[in-house]
Every structure is written in structure tokens, then in C-alpha cells.
Amino acid sequence: MKYDFKSVEKFYQDKWDFSVSKSGKQEKCYVLEMFPYPSGKIHMGHLRNYAIGDVIARYKRANGFEVLHPIGWDAFGLPAENAARDNNISPETWTKENIDNMRTQLKSIGLSYNWERELSTCEPDYYKHEQKFFLDFLKHGLAYRKESWVNWDPVDQTVLANEQVVDGKGWRSGAVVEKRKLSQWFLKITDFAEDLLKCLQSLKNWPEKVKTMQERWIGKSEGATIEFEVVGLNKKLKVFTTYPHTLFGASFCAVAAEHPIVQDLKNGSSVVIPVLDTGIQEIKSKRENDEKIGVYTGLNVKHPFLDKELPLYIANFVLMEYGEGAIFGCPAHDQRDFEFAQKYNLPIIPVISSAHLGVIPARDQNSYNGSQCQATQMTKEAYTGDGTMFNSEFLNGLMVSEAKEAIVKKFEEKKIGKKTINYRLHDWGVSRQRYWGCPIPIIYCKDCGTVPVPEKDLPVVLPIDVEFTSGGNPLDKHPTWKFVDCPKCGKQAERETDTFDTFFESSWYFAAFCSEDKSIDKDACNRFMPVDYYIGGIEHAILHLLYSRFFCRALTKCGYFDIKEPFSTLITQGMVCHATYKDENGKWLFPAEAKELIARGAKVQVGKVEKMSKSKKNTVDPNFIIEKYGADTARLFVLSDTPPEKDMEWSDDGVEGCSRYVNKLWRMVMQLRPVNIHYDNENVTGGLLEYRKKIHKLLHGLTDDLENCRLNCVVAKFREMTNLIAEIDVKTGKSLIDEGICILIRVIEPFIPHLAESLWQEIGGQPWPKADESLLVDDTVTIAVQINGKLRTTIKVAINLPQEELKKIAIDSVSSKIDQSKVRTVYAVPNKIVNIVI
């Protein structure tokens, strides 16, 4: 008789209902996996992600929690527009068809979702709420519009947030990002920068790596702002620095290519420099981490304390987004400045003494001049360590930390600067020049200016009749949609045609799941939030997770609920990896193709194991595995062997092994029927007692593993339990076998639920089992037996055995190795060791 997984799995998938109770009497547990983009097909990464979450949800449900475990679709985004353009199909149709396909696939995995709470971010019933949030953000000063330099993706033809630029390229298209000046809507995430930073320490159940990444992105810097006078202009150049103590070593100043002073130069309001435009274009083409290049502006600035001028450059390593978009360069103590100074033959003036540069005698410090300092150009790098200040007038002799305080105090006395805290984090630009996104609820009127759409007119819904025949935003070209009467004066006005960044939708969806109508219901949110277990990839550490933390603070400020942190425990699951294959011509092969070629004797290049990806074809279709082996086998494999947070390597043999285990377990229970759920094994002794102890110790251990998300350890323990039960003699230990099976079937359910549920029909359902505490305590102990301090054997004896009895048993255990008449003395430490001295 063979286990018919197909009929069993379909039966229970059709039967299961995991709706959320409305009573609110049970303790809640909110389990959520990061919701998917509806690409049309799930991959192995999805399967692993959702299986991890489902184990936690099922385990918590078995322990009496009211579990919220919803699913939805992150449905807006550029791929839908590309598909519309390529296939002559509307983004809405493409998206909804994909959702239907993926819903079917997810249900085939047997996930215990609250399907009644399913949502899709492209539905007006969903995004009408975020349009209202935006209007409330405006009222509370958390949203504003300004003209600013933005990151422009020339391929996707849209603006990117700083977080969406990776190594100077668009995170999705891979195109080199350009700088453009556009009017954009921003959210004031910087209002919460300090709180976002401080509260990272309260997230005890977040991976340290994620917290470190966010800490670095927020980028708190303590330093000073200094004003330099621009020679020949009635202007001041404001500079932020974290190294104010090195000011006496400054040999130049530099600004970003987008700095306002550069625009003044280009407009001819001050100095005309023929090569300026060419130089700026070259600078813009070079990223921050490229070779350090610059162009001299023809301007100089006055040193605040010395009678000298510093040349002003435009440089590629100065970022407009950081500080004031301007720096002073001290080449001796900053590596970027050092490389720049070497390229443009600028003085390198050390002001911190160290073994690296050589200590300047105190008597010579004040006479140490720039020309002498230039001799230090023999050094190959800047010195950035601690030391004593010299060649710095009133700072001479001070340690670096003292010098920082002293010079800032001097800035404040002279009213040329002050102590400043700066953040790398900048306000979130949310305007995108795309159609398939949530419309920004703003109207522009020539007479009234910027007018919010009245709340009664929400949602502002996307038009369906748009064309994708050319680039850019179709909403800009729509003949009717963007034209609307002004809500204030009634005259003709125009809608905002930009849509929200799609991270806007994913920054609050977890709160929408709390209520049945997908709104932000304060009581429902305060009941279920924060999410107790949030599962997803570490690639979302900065973008999605940081924005979500900001949104909770913003919504709390606007009175929607009282939650600052959205996610209590964050599990960043690793990737699913597979070997890569190429044929003789270097063409990528699917694993099945490679297997077939190898079987035919053809040459196949086997590459390294990498993350599964479409481009390298090293993928395995979850649907194929589910069809061939069943959902339980697929789930078990992605949860076995590897901790959730680590990358796992695909193995066909591993899948086969999981399939064999599922079938073995089914056969074992079938052969041992009927199973008596009213077993009584309180009085078992001897070998059966030892088996019972082992079963309960495994139960205790795997329960602890589940509490701590060591899911691979749970699998190892219930497989060990299966083997133990199979060893028990059915003639003498049937009652213990029954107990073991009842425990085993219950603990496998979160992992292989279809099989477990079908077997429960034989034994009856029950709550999560609890280990018998009395069986967890050993009544025996292993003792080391030494002869003259050297280990000879070990003995197992009763705990707290009297010392004389312990000595006798120890001597008997080594009787073949010693002459007992020569024993001089015996030292015994109960429960630990015996040493026989001869």
C-alpha cells in the first residue's frame, strides 16, 4: 500500500480554514512573511520563506494562540508597465492574472493563511487609505514638495530614492544613474532620524547585521559647521566636517557638482571659466568611489584662522546629499583628500603627530611651516589615527579629542561655526514618473497653488485607457484624466501625474492586515501589532524595513495607532542555491538539461554553487517538486539541514530522502494501527522507561528549538524520534509506541501538515504535547574512574550514590587492571570522579 499524497494534499487544502477569531480572548501571535510581487510564478526562495513562516504559525496555533497569518500582493511596479508595453495588455490585467496563478501555487503548498484577509496594493480599496495618510502627513508637516537634485534612471525613466541606487546604478535596471533637478514630493523621515537610530537597540530579536546596516545608513555624525568667506564674492561657503581639529592642515576646499555656487559660476554671475562645463560633466560621470577628480573653480576661500587662501574645487567625491555639499580638504589626515592632493599637487600638511609621520619637537611646532610639511609627501597614505596636535596654533599640544572641543568653542566665539550633528539619512523622495502606482492626491491650480484632494473625493483612481507606445509617464499624456476642477475655486486645474514610490505601499501593509476591511483600525492594530515574527530576505534591510519603521512613527504621530516598531522578531532567511552548468559553448543550462547531457556523455561545465537565478538557469521549479513528490516533501526539504538564516544548497538526493521519510512515517503508522490515544505509561520500567525518557527529552528539545526558530534542529529531532519508536518491541511496548506516535504526529504537523492531518484521523487531534518534567531529569550519572590520575574507564551509577558504594563499584570496574591488595587509597567525588591510588 502506497501513500497517495496527491489526493490527501488536495483534500486538506480544500478543507482547511484558518480564519481569525473575532473574540480577541486568546493571546495573539502575528506571523507574516514579506508579501510577494505578483510576477506570475513562485520560486524556491518563496517556498522557503513561506514554509518558515507557516511552521511558526502552525506551532503557535497548536499552543493556543490566536494567530494572524495573512497574505497579500505587492502589486504595483514597473514590470507590469513593461509587460503592458511588450504584450499589448493592461498592467491591471497582467497583474491580476499573475495573482490568480500565484494564489493557486501558494495554496498547493498547504500554507495556513488567513485567506479572508488577502489584499492587493493595486486595488483602490487599499490605496485610498494611503492617499489619506499622505494628506494627514501634509497636515502634520511630514510631507512637502521641493525642487531638488534627484537620482534619475535613464532606462526606467523615473526617479530613484538614495536607497535604490546601488554602486551608482539603478537597483532594478542596472543603468548608471544621472542627476536631475525636479520638483518632487518628500516624506520627512529625517524628523525621526535620532529615534530610528536609538530604538535599534530595543530590537533584541533582530539580526545584528541588519541593525548595523540601518545604523550606517542613518549615519549619525557629530562634528561642526564652519563658514568660509569666498574671496571676491559676497558669499559664505558652509562646510560640515567631523574633523574640525584638522583645519590648520587644510590646503583646499571642494564642493559637489550640484552645489549652488557652481550654478552661480555657470550662470556667469561671478567668474567665467571656459572649461567649467566640461569639467563638471566629467565629475558627474565619475562615482564617489572612482578615481578622485576635480576642476578648479577660479575661486578661493579665506582660511578662518590663518592669513592664507584655499583654492576652491568641484570634486566627484563630495556629495550634495551629505552635510552641506562642501568640504575642506586636509590631505595629511583623510585618504580621499590625500589622493586628490597628490593628483593636483596640493600641499599635504600634517597637524597630528604620530610614529607614522614622526613627532615634531615641541620647541619647533610653531615654526613648522607648509613648505616643510610638503616633505611628508613621501608618505603613501593619510594618517587617520589619534595623536597630539602641532602646527595648529592654539591647539598645539592637545590630544585629538581635546582639540575637537577647543576649536568648536573657538568657532562659536568668532561666530563662524558651531557644533553640529549630521545624518547621512535624507528625506524620502516618493514621487515616481510611472503609471502603475498609487496616484498622489494633489491638484495644481494656477490661482490657488497646490491643493490637496478633498478626503470625500478619495480614492483618486488610475485611468484604464492609457497608452504605452512611448517612454515616460502615460498619465502626463492622458487627454482627460489629469484635467480637473480646483476644489477651492472651481477653475480648471491639473492633477499631479506622478505616482508614489511602490515602497509606500509596502511600508504599511502589515497594519492593513489587522482589520477585515484593510483600513487602519486603531483597536485592531493595537490588538495585533507589532508583528511577532517577520520573515524575509536581508536585501530589504535598509529600504523596506527602514521605511516601515518610519511609517509606524508617522502614523502614530497622526493618531492612527500607538506603535513605534512594526516587527518584534525579524528572521532573514538565507537564499536557496544550486550548482551552475554550461555546455561546451558556454551557454547556461538548466539542471535537468545538464543531467541529460551528462547521461549522454556530453561535456558539461559544472560551475560554483550560487543563488538560484533565471539568468544562470540554476533553478528548480517548486511546482515540479510538488507534483512529483508532494507539498509535504517540498516543505520538509527546504526546512531540513540548514538553519533558516543560512543559505541552503539544493540537493536532488536530499529531496529523495525527505520523500522516503514521509512514506516511511506513513507506513509505520499504518502498520501500528489502531493507535490508542488513552495510553498509560506512568509505570514502565527498564528498557521501556529509557525509551520513554528519550522520547520526552526529544520533545522537550524540539519544543525549545521551535521557540527559538532552530527549525533544522527540530527536523533532526523528530526524525530521531521516528527511529526510536520503530525500535520499540510492539509486543511488550505497544502502549509506549502509541504515546510516541501521538507525540510524533503532533510535532511534525507544522512541517508536513497534510500527512500529519491525515494520520490524525487515525489517532484523533490533540494540542501541542508537553514533555513530562520528571523524565527529563537523569537518575544516573557517568563517573570517570582514574588510576593514579589517569583515566581508565567510566561507570554509570545512581545519582548521589553513597561514597563507599561508589568506591567499591569503581574498584570492581578496573579489577582486571589492578592488584586490589596494592590499593593505597581511593578518592571519590560523588557524581563526578573516582581516583584510585596504588
Curated annotation (Swiss-Prot):
> Could you say which protein family the record assigns here?
Belongs to the class-I aminoacyl-tRNA synthetase family.
**Reactions performed catalytically:** tRNA(Leu) + L-leucine + ATP = L-leucyl-tRNA(Leu) + AMP + diphosphate
Q: List the subcellular locations.
A: Cytoplasm
Identify the Pfam families for this entry: Anticodon_1, tRNA-synt_1, tRNA-synt_1_2, tRNA-synt_1g
What Gene Ontology terms for biological process does this UniProt record contain? Answer: leucyl-tRNA aminoacylation
Gene encoding this polypeptide?
leuS
Q: Which GO terms describe its cellular component?
A: cytosol
Which source organism? Wolbachia pipientis wMel
Descriptive protein name: Leucine--tRNA ligase
Q: Which InterPro entries does the entry link to?
A: aa-tRNA-synth_I_CS, aa-tRNA-synth_Ia, Leu-tRNA-ligase, Leu_tRNA-synth_edit, M/V/L/I-tRNA-synth_anticd-bd, Methionyl/Leucyl_tRNA_Synth, Rossmann-like_a/b/a_fold, tRNAsynth_Ia_anticodon-bd
Q: In which residues does the motif 'HIGH' region occur?
A: 36-46
Q: Span of the secretion signal?
A: none
One GO molecular-function entry? ATP binding
Q: What is its EC number?
A: 6.1.1.4
Which UniProt keywords are listed? Aminoacyl-tRNA synthetase, ATP-binding, Cytoplasm, Ligase, Nucleotide-binding, Protein biosynthesis
Q: Which domain of life is it from?
A: Bacteria
Record-listed ATP binding positions = K614
Indicate the enzyme's highest-level EC class: ligase
At which positions is motif 'KMSKS' region?
A: 611-615
